[in-house]
Amino acid sequence: MVSLLSFFLLLLVPIFFLLIFTKKIKESKQNLPPGPAKLPIIGNLHQLQGLLHKCLHDLSKKHGPVMHLRLGFAPMVVISSSEAAEEALKTHDLECCSRPITMASRVFSRNGKDIGFGVYGDEWRELRKLSVREFFSVKKVQSFKYIREEENDLMIKKLKELASKQSPVDLSKILFGLTASIIFRTAFGQSFFDNKHVDQESIKELMFESLSNMTFRFSDFFPTAGLKWFIGFVSGQHKRLYNVFNRVDTFFNHIVDDHHSKKATQDRPDMVDAILDMIDNEQQYASFKLTVDHLKGVLSNIYHAGIDTSAITLIWAMAELVRNPRVMKKAQDEIRTCIGIKQEGRIMEEDLDKLQYLKLVVKETLRLHPAAPLLLPRETMADIKIQGYDIPQKRALLVNAWSIGRDPESWKNPEEFNPERFIDCPVDYKGHSFELLPFGSGRRICPGIAMAIATIELGLLNLLYFFDWNMPEKKKDMDMEEAGDLTVDKKVPLELLPVIRISL
């Protein structure tokens, strides 16, 4: 075994140096973007310790908004300005709308059978159209209005019970429960709080494990076939990745099986029912046949991107409001003046139409705290130029939305939480304005914007209407430290003291 391993390593060494030599000759003839000096073998990996979006932000301040890195053997271009992002996501959208294939993306997308990680092509386009029609369209989002209202009612009842004890509550946990319960009912046709297959804590733990395993693996930085496999095997990354994937897949199998068994008695068919009908009827597209793997791929996208991101945005919004009493008071004054006393005790989504300042608070939260600070990486499908630099074909592109949202060239006092900056400001979060990219832009823009905004705005409205919020007595300052991988949450859970409004 030892001699075989030694032979394998001996074989890889000349291949490794040949690849480096060939790549250096080719790159020397191109006008690549600037970047930090690269070490042999590891490239710039040693400079990316800590939160990746902050490391890249700091490097971009020195090397510019279009920056070239080499992570191991894998070259990457990082974009950190609105102008460069517009060139990549609008001018060259078609040439930049594929995804790099990593070990995690291949496994979790079931070899490209999803809309998050799948490479660009006919199969991806048809699957995205299907997902939008059955779940993400404005009409579908409106049809789920009653679910969002019911789940917010349940959250408020729970908070009132906790508030009566006059002790701090873990608002992070409660808000995760809110967004999870909405997604479980709308997408999966199941209850989050009373799920027979997994308990609440297991679902949350599994999601965070999945998200941490979806990032680049160390083996992805050495894409030579034999070396990539060897690193993944020896480090145990392969084993951990497949272990998490199999647990997620088991959960989705339960969802599919439940829908098959309840098909005849289902009062309100959901997205899973609709896609299962197409599969049973052997729906055939020009380039592929719809399968259960496609369904589970879409379910995985909704599960991983729909629950965590909305909860994180609500958590950051509440943290910023408590830190900024002026903004909190202005938001609550608007809400309580416009809505008045609700005799039936329920907030309706129609109430949001009256609340312009609340919408500004959400915008400002998305600017300062995008739930996914780095947009999912894209891959160029042709040679292009961005800001005058050569970007070769099959080059990974990473857009730092966090950095763009804090760019002093676009935003006055960018570190300040100031919703008023959006008054009479045409910048929006729908992919048309490149100064604000929490959902991305172009062909790869997040299809769940309408669902996310409806969930966030209604949740925030309920929290601010029914309660006043204070810091726990023992805490003087709000800890705003970040933590995470694909998504970035508060490192310390948000604990606040809710006070029920006397007038209600």
UniProtKB/Swiss-Prot annotation:
It comes from the Eukaryota. Gene3D superfamilies: Cytochrome P450. The chain crosses the membrane at residues 1-21. It is found in: Membrane. Its cofactor is heme. Keywords: Heme, Iron, Membrane, Metal-binding, Monooxygenase, Oxidoreductase, Transmembrane, Transmembrane helix. Heme binds at C446. Pfam families: p450. It is a single-pass membrane protein. GO terms for molecular function: heme binding; iron ion binding; monooxygenase activity; oxidoreductase activity, acting on paired donors, with incorporation or reduction of molecular oxygen. Its EC number is 1.14.-.-. One of its GO terms (cellular component) is membrane. Belongs to the cytochrome P450 family. This is Cytochrome P450 71B4. It comes from Arabidopsis thaliana. The lineage of its organism: Eukaryota, Viridiplantae, Streptophyta, Embryophyta, Tracheophyta.
